[in-house]
Design a protein with these regions (language model features):
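Domain-scale activation on soluble regions of proteins
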Residues: 38, 49, 79-80
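Thiol-based oxidoreductase modules, predominantly thioredoxin-like and allied folds used
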Residues: 34-46
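Local sequence-structure signature of Cys/Sec-based thiol-disulfide redox active-site neighborhoods
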Residues: 1-28
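Ser/Thr/Gly-rich flexible loops in soluble cytosolic domains mediating phosphotransfer, phosphorylation
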Residues: 76-92
Length: 92
């Protein structure tokens, strides 16, 4: 079982989002030692999931586990800021 669970809500996978996701996965592999699950959800295909998580804008990245739940809305291209905002940076 993974220690971290992340969900990314998107409207569609643009090249910018794809690049940000790849970079985020690489950093999570390094920072979280690969102990995470990462799910990408297209709100056009699964609007009920977005409604359940109260997603009002895309992209929205949600860290569900470990608690507390945290979210980043908007640009996810700066992975360091994203990891800091989600409280995922390793403590040195």
């Amino acid at each position: 079982m993974s220690t971290y669970f992340l969900k990314l809500y998107v409207t569609n996978m643009t090249p910018k989002i794809e690049g940000s996701v790849e970079k985020l996965r690489q950093v999570c592999d390094q920072e979280l030692n690969g102990e995470y699950d990462f799910k990408i959800i297209n709100i056009l295909e699964n609007p009920q999931l977005a409604e359940g998580d109260r997603v009002l804008a895309t992209p929205t990245l949600i860290k569900e586990l470990p608690t507390p739940v945290k979210r980043i809305i908007g640009d996810i291209s700066n992975t360091e800021k994203v990891l800091f905002g989600l409280d995922l940076l390793k403590k040195d």
